[in-house]
């Protein structure tokens, strides 16, 4: 995966909904190396296709973590909440 946002490398992303126009609603997990250690974030994300074959993404409602296990647990919890709707 070669996706980045706000300095975070997106290391996991799962689509939980797709509109008929191809817009995807996702939960993503990001990682960033800093001088203070590795930081993690989970975001909700909307991704839609562009006419040139690429895609545009927006990221919002971030949950920030300094522990990978907690970030991954948050990632899975957020996905579970979306699938249970």
What are these regions (language model features)?
Residues 1-21:
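Negatively charged, low-complexity tracts enriched in Asp/Glu with abundant Ser/Thr
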Residues 1-3, 80-85:
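Short intrinsically disordered terminal tails
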Residues 21-30:
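Charged, amphipathic alpha-helical segments
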Residues 17, 39, 82:
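Conserved catalytic or regulatory cores that recognize and/or transform ribose-phosphate-containing ligands
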Residues 29-62, 78:
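Short aromatic-glycine-(Arg/Gly/Cys) micro-motifs in beta-strand/loop hairpins
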């Amino acid at each position: 995966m070669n996706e980045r946002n706000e300095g975070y490398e997106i290391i996991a992303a799962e689509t939980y909904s797709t509109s008929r126009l191809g817009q995807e609603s996702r939960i993503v997990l990001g990682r960033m190396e800093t001088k203070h250690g590795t930081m993690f974030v989970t975001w909700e994300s909307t991704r839609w296709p562009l006419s040139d074959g690429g895609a545009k993404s927006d990221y919002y409602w971030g949950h920030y973590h300094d522990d990978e296990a907690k970030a991954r647990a948050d990632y899975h919890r957020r996905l579970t909440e979306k699938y249970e709707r």
